[in-house]
Amino acid sequence: LSGAVASGVAMGATSCVPPDQSPSGRLLAQLRIIEAQADATLGVELYDTGSKMSLGLNADRRFGHCSSFKFSLAAKVLTEDARGLIDADRRVTWTKDELMFVSPFTTKRLKEGATLRELAGATQKYADNSAANVLLRELGGPAALTGFWRSIGDETSRLDRIEPALNNVPVTEIRDTSTPAAMARTVAKLVYGDVMPDAARATLKQWMADTPTGARRVRAGLPGKWPSGDKTGTSMWLGSERLYVDIGYVEPPENAPLTF
């Protein structure tokens, strides 16, 4: 874990000599420097899907999902379709009143509607807010997504509201939150585990790789040849601190995949 990550992510902290000179120690020191320089709280969990080892900073602290919950929502669609619980090719419609900001796909498809599968892809790749709300409407609401997390062993993550209210997450809020430790393992289960069949996992993984916003976050610091994918989230809710989220996977050469 530590060797693969430390060799692949440049943190620019050569002026500090951490007391722990192991790769894990150096990486953790670099993360703390980033946190201090940003004058913010940095929550990180890097999970090695091979060794099951992890390295984290504030990994058990709760942070808001912002749009990152849409990864799990898309996974829920694919999983329940594979299990015969829903038909992901069922077409649904929505009204103009249901459209909101950051809804490029649903705005374009207002007249004709879309399948649940198309909405899942749109909410993962383009963070389409209206697509997420329509899916939540069709699949049982925020509580149903929380139930999906519980069904795969995630006892931490929760969704309580829909867009845009779920982005209002003050520091003391527990609604609509997860922890880096919980989400890194949830990503591992959904992308590399046996929650869904291979074809569905391949679809989800490709959607993550095709998500353009990730190119400006964690993936921007990775070697270009390393396969990777993610889901970002951002909140600039008035009266709350800004929040930036990125969850995903990376496949370093000669190392098991890592999730974060």
Set out the residue ranges of the language-model regions:
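Beta-lactamase-like hydrolase cores
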Residues: V17-R62
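Active-site SXXK
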Residues: K52, F63-W94, F260
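Active-site-proximal alpha-helical segments within enzyme catalytic domains
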Residues: F71-S72, I174-A209, R242-F260
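Short, Gly/Ser/Thr-enriched beta-strand-loop segments that form substrate-interacting elements
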Residues: R216-L258
